[in-house]
């Protein structure tokens, strides 16, 4: 179990600060929730049984919300799928859904629970926010009736959406977000387009998206670049994948790369590798939690800056390829070999010596590493790897990755496979790459899945370097680039109304064109 602590003195300080009207910082909370799951069934349960299960989960969330408020938290994020779990069909999830209105309707469900039909879950969540004077983000399912004569309307007459809601300190619904990038969620529909949802508070502007959304330009990058949000609220049901995509590793890197606060609440389910929540700032993690040993939930709190981009403590813009494109490449090793991380083919070269300078390239991406180990463990092998291309089985997202990583064994065929422990410490490392994208996320992961706050930094010229001498034993040091403009076209793992419409139009036009050719 990995947990960084939250000192009570911070809560006291924040309360005093708020009393004198300062809004430069606030206390945030996230809760990692071990979801009480429904019994496995292929037939829908009754609406009453669905509500009973959701209330069991809300009972647990209520305790966390009250504890967070008592410690001075102004806002709390709870996880994706926290009320009922994740394994459903369209039919079996339906009893759990409510009609969630647009926040423009000016609604406090706690005071008017029947205004939009049967909405007991929304009413209870609203009351929890109101009674504890805290902003609450929760994830639940939204259902929207549609006209059966509309070709995009599903057979049951409803669009169904994976949805985040936010209630303010008065219990008012202030934000609603429908997840766009679904991941193996046949129970839900894909919205017509990515929604760009923000809301303002006395302690900053907030944006919202969910889980798999974080890998794409919309909505996340647009919220930061065009809507200038200070903090992202991020509920997720994240399954950890070593070596590059553990929750705490990638989420802390995203916050640093984008220059915003990221409040992450993950579900907790060890058998599915679901754990890893945190409160991340642009200069590193404030608090995080990773626990693969217990089935317990965890409340995390930390003070964060309300407007991190305006703080002098945070770095200025990085030119990610400035250093790598101006230096003379280090000697490219003759023994470069091919290996895989998940399904992605990397070019690797081994770190044979205790210290050195290495370059490994793949197509247009060259990765440069300077390093010095304190002592090279004989039973551990490290490699420098490069990958540029469309990622994974779906081949949707274009990645550019430079990574220093420990191989699972001394057999080079195991390089890129998951490994959780290491003994080798590095006195110095400097990693850079000839990235074609400005969106690069710096990752450092230590033995037993620890982060390394305050032990590394990104220089303005794009180098990821260690600070203050040696680090803990290293699992990975990576620069994870996303080249969004090279992504392939796709539809998410749900039902996209617009995608179906465009496909039908395209087929119709092709038929007309062929008919015209035949007539000629």
UniProtKB/Swiss-Prot annotation:
The function of this protein is:
Amidohydrolase that hydrolyzes specifically one of the carboamide linkages in D-pantetheine thus recycling pantothenic acid (vitamin B5) and releasing cysteamine. Involved in the thymus homing of bone marrow cells. May regulate beta-2 integrin-mediated cell adhesion, migration and motility of neutrophil.
Transmembrane ranges, per UniProt, are: none
User: Where does it mainly reside?
Assistant: membrane
Position of the signal peptide: 1-22
A biological process (GO) of this protein is: pantothenate metabolic process
Tissue and organ expression note = Widely expressed with higher expression in spleen and blood.
Q: Does the keyword Hydrolase apply?
A: yes
Q: Which residues are processed away as propeptide to yield the mature protein?
A: 494-520
Where does this protein come from, organism-wise?
Homo sapiens
Gene3D superfamilies in the record, alphabetically?
Answer: Carbon-nitrogen hydrolase
Q: Quickly give the catalysed reaction.
A: (R)-pantetheine + H2O = cysteamine + (R)-pantothenate
Query: Which terms in the Gene Ontology molecular function aspect does this entry carry?
Result: pantetheine hydrolase activity
Looking at the UniProt record for this protein, which Gene Ontology cellular component terms does it annotate, in alphabetical order? extracellular region; plasma membrane; side of membrane
The family classification in the record reads:
Belongs to the carbon-nitrogen hydrolase superfamily. BTD/VNN family.
Q: Where is the lipid attached (GPI-anchor amidated cysteine)?
A: 493
* Subcellular compartments: Cell membrane
Q: Which residues form the active site?
A: 80 (proton acceptor), 179 (proton donor), 211 (nucleophile)
Any idea what this protein is called? Pantetheine hydrolase VNN2
């Amino acid at each position: 179990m990995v947990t960084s602590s939250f000192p009570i003195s911070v809560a006291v300080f924040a309360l005093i600060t708020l009393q004198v009207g300062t809004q430069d910082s606030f206390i945030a909370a996230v809760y990692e929730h071990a979801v009480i799951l429904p019994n496995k069934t292929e037939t829908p349960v009754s609406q009453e049984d669905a509500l009973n299960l959701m209330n069991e989960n809300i009972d647990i969330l209520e305790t966390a919300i009250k504890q967070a408020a008592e410690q001075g938290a102004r806002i709390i994020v709870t996880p994706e799928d926290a009320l009922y779990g994740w394994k459903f069909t369209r039919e079996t999830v339906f009893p759990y859904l409510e009609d969630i209105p647009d926040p423009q309707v000016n609604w406090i469900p706690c005071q008017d629970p029947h205004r939009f039909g049967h909405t007991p879950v929304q009413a209870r969540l609203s009351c929890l926010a109101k009674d504890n004077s805290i902003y609450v983000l929760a994830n639940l399912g939204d259902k929207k009736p549609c006209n059966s004569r509309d070709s995009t309307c599903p057979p049951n007459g409803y669009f169904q959406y994976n949805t985040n809601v936010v209630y303010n300190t008065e219990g008012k619904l202030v934000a609603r977000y429908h997840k766009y990038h679904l991941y193996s969620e046949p129970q839900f529909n894909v919205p017509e387009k990515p929604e760009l949802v923000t809301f303002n508070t006395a302690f900053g502007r907030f944006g919202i998206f969910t889980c798999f959304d974080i890998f794409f330009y919309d909505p996340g990058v647009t919220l930061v670049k065009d809507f200038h949000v200070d903090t992202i609220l991020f509920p997720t049901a994240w399954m950890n994948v070593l070596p590059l995509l553990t929750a705490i590793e990638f989420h802390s890197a995203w916050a640093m790369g984008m220059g915003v606060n990221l409040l992450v609440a993950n579900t907790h389910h060890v058998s599915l590798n679901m754990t890893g929540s945190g409160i991340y700032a642009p200069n590193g993690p404030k608090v995080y939690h990773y626990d693969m040993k217990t089935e317990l939930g965890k409340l995390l709190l930390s003070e964060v800056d309300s407007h991190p981009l305006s703080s002098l403590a945070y770095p200025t813009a990085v030119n990610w390829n400035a250093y790598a494109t101006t230096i003379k490449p280090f000697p490219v090793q003759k023994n470069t070999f091919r290996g895989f991380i998940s399904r992605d083919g990397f070019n690797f070269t081994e770190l044979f010596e205790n210290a050195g300078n290495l370059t490994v390239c793949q197509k247009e991406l060259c990765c440069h590493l300077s390093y010095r180990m304190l002592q090279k463990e004989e039973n551990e092998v490290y490699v420098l790897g490069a990958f540029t291309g469309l990622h994974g089985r779906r081949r949707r997202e274009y990645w550019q990755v430079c990574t220093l990583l420990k191989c699972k064994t001394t057999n080079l065929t195991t390089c890129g496979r998951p490994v959780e422990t290491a003994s080798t410490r590095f006195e110095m490392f400097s990693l850079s790459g000839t990235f074609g994208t400005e969106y690069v996320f710096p990752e450092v992961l230590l033995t037993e899945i620890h982060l390394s706050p305050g032990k590394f930094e990104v220089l303005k010229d794009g180098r990821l370097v260690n600070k203050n001498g040696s680090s803990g034993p290293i699992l990975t040091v990576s620069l994870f680039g996303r080249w969004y403009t090279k992504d392939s076209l796709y539809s998410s793992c749900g039902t996209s109304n617009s995608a179906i419409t465009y496909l039908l139009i395209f087929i119709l036009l092709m038929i007309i064109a062929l008919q015209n050719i035949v007539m000629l």
